[in-house]
C-alpha cells in the first residue's frame, strides 16, 4: 500500500483537466497537484482510470519484443471492458496520467490510435517498455494506470464526475463515488457537485449527495449561483460567483441567445457571464472555485 503523500489528486473530465481551480487549491495548501482530469470522459471511464473499476484484458499475447498488441477496437468492442462489465473509452482526448501502465507485471504504454475522439477506426494498443519473455494472458488481468499505482494515496483526493453522464441513476453515481473512495488510500476526500443546471433540476442529485457525503460534498452550482440580496432582503443584486470576482451582473450572448445574469441567478443557475461557454469556467471563476475549496477544507480541518 502506498503511504500518504503531501499532494492533492483530482479526478474528473475537462472541468478538472482544464485546471485553474485545482492548481489554485494546491497553491493555497502548499501542496503538489496531480491532475487526473481528461476531457470528454464520463463517470465510468474516470472510475476505471482511477482503478476502482479497473480496466481488464484477456486472451491476448504480449510479444517479447517492443511491438504494439491490440487491446480493443472502437468499431467492434466499443472500448475496453472493466471488471464490473462496463465498457470505457480512455485516452480519446489525451491523459498523460494513464502511462506508463501495467498489464500484470509488464510495464508499457496504452495508446489510442484514432485521429480524434470520434474516430471509429481507432484502436487501443499496449506496447511493452522493454523486451522480455512473451506473456500469454488467458485470465482477466487488470490494466493499472500510472496514477492508480502512484497517485492514489494523496493527502486530499477531489472527485468531480458526472457532467458527461456514465451512470444509470443516482444510486449508481453514489456507488461509483464510494468505489473510488474505497479504492484510494486518500487521507481526505472532497466530492464536487456539478455546476450546470438549475436549483430545481439539480435538487434530487444534490439532496442525495448531501445525504451520502455530508459536508464533504460541495455543490459548485450552489456556491457560484448563491444569490446576494439587496437591502430589502428580497431583491437579488448579485451572486457569489460574480461578487467574488468583483463583477457586476450583466448579460452575455452565447450561441445566439442572450442570457441575463440576474434572471439566471433567480433560478439557481450559474450565470453565463462567468463561464467560457455553457459549462466551462473562465479564469476568474476557476480562481474563485479554488479559493472557496481551500476555505471549505480549512473549515473541515483538512488544512
Kindly label every feature range from the protein language model.
Residues 12, 37-40, 162, 285:
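Glycine-centered flexibility sites
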Residues 22-28, 47, 51-68, 74-303:
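Alpha-helical cap/lid subdomain in secreted, periplasmic
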Residues 30-47:
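A short beta-strand-loop structural module common to alpha/beta enzyme folds
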Amino acid at each position: 500500500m502506498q503511504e500518504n503523500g503531501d499532494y492533492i489528486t483530482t479526478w474528473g473530465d475537462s472541468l478538472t483537466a482544464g485546471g485553474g481551480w485545482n492548481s489554485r487549491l494546491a497553491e493555497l495548501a502548499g501542496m503538489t497537484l496531480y491532475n487526473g482530469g481528461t476531457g470528454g470522459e464520463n463517470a465510468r471511464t474516470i472510475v476505471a482510470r482511477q482503478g476502482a473499476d479497473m480496466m481488464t484484458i484477456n486472451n491476448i499475447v504480449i510479444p517479447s519484443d517492443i511491438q504494439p498488441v491490440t487491446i480493443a477496437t472502437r468499431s467492434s468492442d466499443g472500448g475496453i471492458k472493466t471488471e464490473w462489465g462496463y465498457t470505457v473509452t480512455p485516452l480519446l482526448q489525451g491523459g498523460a496520467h494513464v502511462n506508463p501502465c501495467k498489464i500484470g507485471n509488464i510495464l508499457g504504454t496504452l495508446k489510442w490510435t484514432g485521429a480524434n475522439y470520434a474516430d471509429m477506426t481507432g484502436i487501443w494498443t499496449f506496447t511493452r517498455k522493454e523486451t522480455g519473455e512473451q506473456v500469454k494472458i488467458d485470465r482477466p488481468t487488470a490494466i493499472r494506470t500510472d496514477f492508480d499505482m502512484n497517485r492514489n494515496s494523496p493527502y486530499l483526493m477531489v472527485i468531480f464526475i458526472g457532467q458527461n453522464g456514465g451512470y444509470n441513476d443516482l444510486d449508481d453515481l453514489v456507488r461509483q463515488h464510494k468505489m473510488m473512495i474505497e479504492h484510494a488510500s486518500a487521507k481526505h476526500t472532497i466530492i464536487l457537485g456539478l455546476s450546470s443546471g438549475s436549483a430545481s433540476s439539480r435538487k434530487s442529485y444534490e439532496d442525495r449527495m448531501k445525504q451520502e457525503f455530508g459536508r464533504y460534498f460541495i455543490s459548485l452550482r450552489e456556491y457560484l449561483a448563491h444569490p446576494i440580496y439587496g437591502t430589502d432582503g428580497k431583491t437579488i443584486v448579485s451572486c457569489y460567483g460574480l461578487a467574488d470576482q468583483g463583477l457586476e451582473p450583466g448579460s452575455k450572448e452565447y450561441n445566439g441567445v442572450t442570457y441575463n445574469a440576474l434572471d439566471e441567478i433567480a433560478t439557481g443557475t450559474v450565470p453565463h457571464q462567468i463561464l467560457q461557454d455553457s459549462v466551462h469556467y473562465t479564469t476568474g471563476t476557476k480562481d474563485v472555485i479554488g479559493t472557496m475549496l481551500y476555505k471549505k477544507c480549512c473549515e473541515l480541518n483538512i488544512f
